[in-house]
């Protein structure tokens, strides 16, 4: 259960979700992600480090640049499941405390 929680925790941030979504289109260097996110390199690197530690992404250093890609593309299936939950919830709001 703790390993699952680690993966879920790594995905539990809007910036990291954006990174995973961006990597679904192919590998990206840190510089590209930094530009798209609008954050400094150290912040983006920290997010990538958490994703790597959870086994979600792999890195490949080429010269001075580091490129990242999804380790297991099926992680995107989780996004579809989240969308289904949100869609269902929007139809029938859940009362707090249920």
State the predicted function of each range.
Residues 10, 53, 84-87:
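Regular, well-ordered alpha-helical segments
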Residues 1-3, 75-98:
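Amphipathic alpha-helical dimerization/coiled-coil segments
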Residues 48-49:
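Short, hydrophobic-biased segments on the C-terminal half of alpha helices
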Residues 2-42, 65-75:
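N-terminal helix-turn-helix DNA-binding core of bacterial DNA-binding proteins
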Residues 37, 56-57, 80:
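Exposed, low-complexity/repetitive linear segments and helix-based recognition motifs
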Residues 52-62, 69:
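Beta-hairpin "wing" of winged helix-turn-helix
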């Amino acid at each position: 259960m703790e390993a699952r929680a680690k993966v879920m925790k790594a995905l539990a941030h809007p910036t990291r979700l954006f990174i995973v979504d961006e990597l679904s289109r192919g590998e990206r260097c840190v510089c590209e992600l930094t530009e798209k996110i609008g954050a400094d390199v150290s912040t983006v690197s920290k997010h990538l480090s958490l994703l790597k530690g959870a086994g979600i992404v792999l890195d490949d250093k080429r010269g001075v640049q580091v490129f990242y890609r999804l380790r297991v593309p099926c992680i995107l299936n989780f996004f579809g499941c989240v969308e289904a939950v949100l869609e269902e919830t929007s139809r029938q709001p859940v009362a707090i405390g249920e």
